[in-house]
Amino acid sequence: MIYDFRKKSKFGYTTGSCAAAGAYSALYYLKFGKKLSYVEIENLNGDKLIIPIEKIEKCGNKAKAVVIKDAGGDIDITNGIEIITEVELKKGKKDVIIKGGEGVGIVTKNGLQVKKGEPAINPKPREMIRNNLLKLLNDDEVVEVTISIPKGKELAKKTLNPKLGIVGGLSILGTTGIVRPMSNEAYMNSLAPQIDVALANGYKRLIFVPGNIGTKYAKQLLNANDDEIIEVSNFWGFMLDKAKEKGVEEILIFGHAGKIIKLAGGIYNTHSKVADCRNEILAAYSSLFIDDKEAIKKILYSNTTEEVIKILEEKGVLNDVFNFIAKRVVERLSERWKGIKFSCIIINMKGEVLGSYIWNKK
């Protein structure tokens, strides 16, 4: 298939594709003296990607190209940033050497696809860069490629890279080189390595949290370490599939009620655009403990989960309801992800425990 990114598309291209396209255009200029306004590269599936080149310049015996990252319809933090590739041609046995420059992170923890101490350029992008550049090389030529991201160090602070032990910049990512619209593919794939890091550091029980609130209180209440806390965002189904695939045996579901209650309803992508039903779920479970139609109606029409918590407190059934919800979360997840031992703790915005359940079934 051909993806032509010279025109606006719902598809986008990854940082790995940017690096491959930039390296190809810079090497082409170095060898043949022609500046290309776009290049056609091939991904590992055999698809053709036509990617525009923003700028090319020569610096002595080196050439440098700039490619602007375009995320298409799946906008992420890297959309619109510059990916710069500098190439230098040397004599030697035909080869492609890939290095990380300014703004590309360095891996400092075990468990990731890239070895500790290496620049965070994943294997698939490396392979794509290598395959495309080898087409331009003679048998006695070696090309050295250095990838830089000018805003990488600053932007990396807003990603999971610091938690994963990738310091000083962003990662060069991409499996197919293509960003698919509204797939959240890049973001989801940035979440999954947390599991690898945790397992590599010997953690047997992982703590799955929706985000910052869960992380904060898991540290305070459970004395948990960063590496055993796995932030899943809204992608519970995806992350639990990954945990199962990687052989995780025990998971504690921990976090604010607003997200966790959706799991009790069998909702495994908890983004409000996908599904909500918080009030409906709360009303259904509360009705098991409250014989008051007006109170149930108030729950159904509440604006926030915190409002529901107040109603349940007034009725004296707060812990009963949330203990039961925690139990249903454990039962639901255990039915679908067999072989993993689940527990669940639900908290409010202050980190106070509303309900919990530990299922000891083997």
Curated annotation (Swiss-Prot):
One of its GO terms (biological process) is methylation. GO terms for molecular function: cobalt-precorrin-5B C1-methyltransferase activity. Its EC number is 2.1.1.195. Pathway: Cofactor biosynthesis; adenosylcobalamin biosynthesis; cob(II)yrinate a,c-diamide from sirohydrochlorin (anaerobic route): step 6/10. The gene is cbiD. Keywords: Cobalamin biosynthesis, Methyltransferase, S-adenosyl-L-methionine, Transferase. It is an enzyme of class 2 (transferase). It catalyses: Co-precorrin-5B + S-adenosyl-L-methionine = Co-precorrin-6A + S-adenosyl-L-homocysteine. PANTHER family: COBALT-PRECORRIN-5B C(1)-METHYLTRANSFERASE. This is Cobalt-precorrin-5B C(1)-methyltransferase. InterPro entries: CbiD, CbiD_sf. Belongs to the CbiD family.
